[in-house]
């Protein structure tokens, strides 16, 4: 029996990060977490590119551009969609999650979903580095593991 697990050694990996400007306060905290996770596992700062987009809805297009490039081993999408009083939240969350998943499947590269979908700002703050950890950090570690697993298979 063969068992494959992606290692958490990131030296030499090149990572693209996409961050939504909408709810930038949250996106910036998620970015800080992702950068911390990548650096702690050995990614050099010069091997990380950050692209800012207007909001979560624009992420799949840039994720596809990055994932199709041989320059990147993994892509991380970060942002926050916070529920309001209309159905807009439902449409954005659904399309962004599908779009990001499709990019990963189409390109064969890990594209991590670090877009918080919360009912209120408090939940977003909790997941961006306070009570509930930092989803950006978690996505960075996941990206490292998946990039290495893909290389192993």
UniProtKB/Swiss-Prot annotation:
<keyword id="KW-0808">Transferase</keyword>
<protein>
    <recommendedName>
        <fullName>6,7-dimethyl-8-ribityllumazine synthase</fullName>
        <ecNumber>2.5.1.78</ecNumber>
    </recommendedName>
</protein>
<keyword id="KW-0686">Riboflavin biosynthesis</keyword>
<comment type="function">
    <text>Catalyzes the formation of 6,7-dimethyl-8-ribityllumazine by condensation of 5-amino-6-(D-ribitylamino)uracil with 3,4-dihydroxy-2-butanone 4-phosphate. This is the penultimate step in the biosynthesis of riboflavin.</text>
</comment>
<dbReference type="GO" id="GO:0005829">
    <property type="term" value="C:cytosol"/>
</dbReference>
<feature type="binding site">
    <location>
        <position position="127"/>
    </location>
    <ligand>
        <name>(2S)-2-hydroxy-3-oxobutyl phosphate</name>
    </ligand>
</feature>
<dbReference type="GO" id="GO:0000906">
    <property type="term" value="F:6,7-dimethyl-8-ribityllumazine synthase activity"/>
</dbReference>
<dbReference type="InterPro" id="IPR036467">
    <property type="entry name" value="LS/RS_sf"/>
</dbReference>
<comment type="pathway">
    <text>Cofactor biosynthesis; riboflavin biosynthesis; riboflavin from 2-hydroxy-3-oxobutyl phosphate and 5-amino-6-(D-ribitylamino)uracil: step 1/2.</text>
</comment>
<dbReference type="InterPro" id="IPR034964">
    <property type="entry name" value="LS"/>
</dbReference>
<dbReference type="GO" id="GO:0009349">
    <property type="term" value="C:riboflavin synthase complex"/>
</dbReference>
<feature type="binding site">
    <location>
        <begin position="56"/>
        <end position="58"/>
    </location>
    <ligand>
        <name>5-amino-6-(D-ribitylamino)uracil</name>
    </ligand>
</feature>
<feature type="binding site">
    <location>
        <begin position="80"/>
        <end position="82"/>
    </location>
    <ligand>
        <name>5-amino-6-(D-ribitylamino)uracil</name>
    </ligand>
</feature>
<feature type="binding site">
    <location>
        <position position="113"/>
    </location>
    <ligand>
        <name>5-amino-6-(D-ribitylamino)uracil</name>
    </ligand>
</feature>
<feature type="active site" description="Proton donor">
    <location>
        <position position="88"/>
    </location>
</feature>
<dbReference type="Pfam" id="PF00885">
    <property type="entry name" value="DMRL_synthase"/>
</dbReference>
<dbReference type="GO" id="GO:0009231">
    <property type="term" value="P:riboflavin biosynthetic process"/>
</dbReference>
<dbReference type="InterPro" id="IPR002180">
    <property type="entry name" value="LS/RS"/>
</dbReference>
<feature type="binding site">
    <location>
        <position position="22"/>
    </location>
    <ligand>
        <name>5-amino-6-(D-ribitylamino)uracil</name>
    </ligand>
</feature>
<comment type="similarity">
    <text>Belongs to the DMRL synthase family.</text>
</comment>
<feature type="binding site">
    <location>
        <begin position="85"/>
        <end position="86"/>
    </location>
    <ligand>
        <name>(2S)-2-hydroxy-3-oxobutyl phosphate</name>
    </ligand>
</feature>
